[in-house]
Amino acid sequence: MRVKKLVMYLIFCLIPCAIFSQSTIALTLPVVTLLDIEPAGTFTLNFTAPTEAGQSLTTPTANTTKWVNYTSAIASGGLTRRITASVNQVIPGVSIRVQAATASGAGGGVLGTSSGLVTLSTTAANIITGIGGAFTGTGANNGHRLTISLAVNTYANLSARTNTPIVITYTITE
């Protein structure tokens, strides 16, 4: 009887251990840095001339149709990322401004923080900081909504112009 118990013990206890197996997988998580402005395309901001002498120019309504989308996977212990903006040219007497809203939509992770209202120049300025491992979702209504506006800063420097192209360059960097 003792032999029978020993055989049963071997069958039920040791055999399951003998069929246990392991696998080793190689995992790669790349460093990712992607940025997009959605939707694509241009928009127009035009000052309106006054209709009566002594009145100031009417400032155009700010554009709020553009969204910053990004994906960021940083190296272990790596620096957070930031998004900068600059313009290809400044217009004398006019401030070109951008403000990124708080991130919203389908994203997740350590999303960046808006730097508030930033007046753009030909030198890159931070508009979003503190981006860690994150994604915003894609397209409009995901990421950070941009408010792009114009303001007169010095009337003495204004000169008439028509259809002057201003290119805003956005860059994601560490």
Question: Across the structure, where does each feature detected by a protein language model lie?
Answer:
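N-terminal small/polar-rich segments of proteins
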Residues: 22-112, 125-174
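Bacterial Sec-dependent N-terminal signal peptides
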Residues: 1-26
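Exoplasmic/lumenal beta-rich domain surfaces
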Residues: 114-117
